[in-house]
Amino acid sequence: MPRPYGADAGPDAPTLVEAALFEAGVPVLIVPDGIDAWTAPRRICLAWNEGDEALTATLRALPILAQADSTFITIIDPPQHGPDRSDPGGLLAPFLARHGVRCEVDVLARTLPRISDHLIRATTDRDVDMMIMGAYGRARWSEAMFGGATRDMLQECPVPLFLAR
């Protein structure tokens, strides 16, 4: 699908994306203009926040992840307290490796205003050709009113964006 927001988006595009994610329960691949959607991604950024949506996206994308040369598990500002605090992504990386995914963990401090700013920067810094993330970790109305990482990425992600929830 093309981006659902922006000057070139049709009036029903956001509704179609949300219907696929919420009603049909299927992943969605958003492909920016000018990018070949038929080329298998070699380098992938996997946005990880330990949420249910991120886990669902990861599981749905396992066949894609297993075929890639590199996957960068990107964790932004992980919790400072909890069982995983000393090793963010420490449970996910071995799980992915058991499924044939070649991955490494990138833990980033939150230094930019929006989570999406970090994710977009990660696509450039790591020269990835796909972003995988969970969609709408907050209520849809909240993202519509106040913005959120999902909506920002739908508008601005420079590489194909695989979303699931």
How would you label these PLM feature ranges?
Residues G10-P11, G51, S86, P113, ...:
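Short alpha-helix boundary/capping motifs
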Residues A7-D8, P79-D84, R110-P113, A139-R140:
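Short, small-residue-enriched loops and turns at beta-alpha junctions
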Residues A13-L16, S86-G90, I120-R121, M145-T150:
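Charged helix-capping and loop-helix junction motifs
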Residues M1-T74, E156-R165:
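Intrinsically disordered or low-complexity boundary/linker segments at protein termini
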Residues R98-M131, Y136-S142, V159:
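Structural beta-alpha unit
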